[in-house]
Amino acid sequence: MSKLDFYPMMSPREIIEAGAFGGCYFGLEIEEYTNYDYQELFDYHFDGLDTSLYLGEKYSPKMNAFKTRSGMPYEYWVEQGWMHQRDPYGWFEWWCKYDMGLRGNDDDRQISRWQNFAGVKGRWRHNIYKKIYESNEDWTIGKRVQQSLLHWGYATNEEDYALWKMMSRRQGGVISS
């Protein structure tokens, strides 16, 4: 795992401003899992933003950039054992703290998760570019996948799509020469 390959395109604020997590990422009542004072995090990243963008009480697909539901319910993540006490809200909470300069013993795991999801060789990044390619370059396809990638600070773009096509050709992937 290399931190050099960890470069989300969007800051936590940009993710929220774009429309993410159904507007309720930090609206879940999970105080029993944490004693962290979130006000510092909110002040650092979201100062001046409408709190309905991140503190809503109910998930609303209309709040998402792609106007679609994306992701699994919080309870599912807890059942899978993927939530840690330091960051009980998950990857995005960790990204907020990491972006503030806070480091912890979960950094390598979280960076690896990002790389596997949205990094250059990430599963979902590959998935969306393959869908775009197979749809005759319809960039409106795969809204749920694109929304999920946005949650991880990644937005599909022409430059990365061209790189994906080049890498796929070299590796004998879905694109034939």
Segment roles from a protein language model:
Residues 1-86, 90, 102, 120-144, ...:
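Compositionally biased, intrinsically disordered low-complexity regions enriched for acidic
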Residues 144-177:
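Charge-patterned, phosphorylation-rich low-complexity C-terminal interaction regions
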Residues 98-125:
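Short linear, low-complexity motifs centered on an aromatic residue
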Residues 106-114, 130, 139-143, 164-165:
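Short glycine-rich, low-complexity/disordered patches
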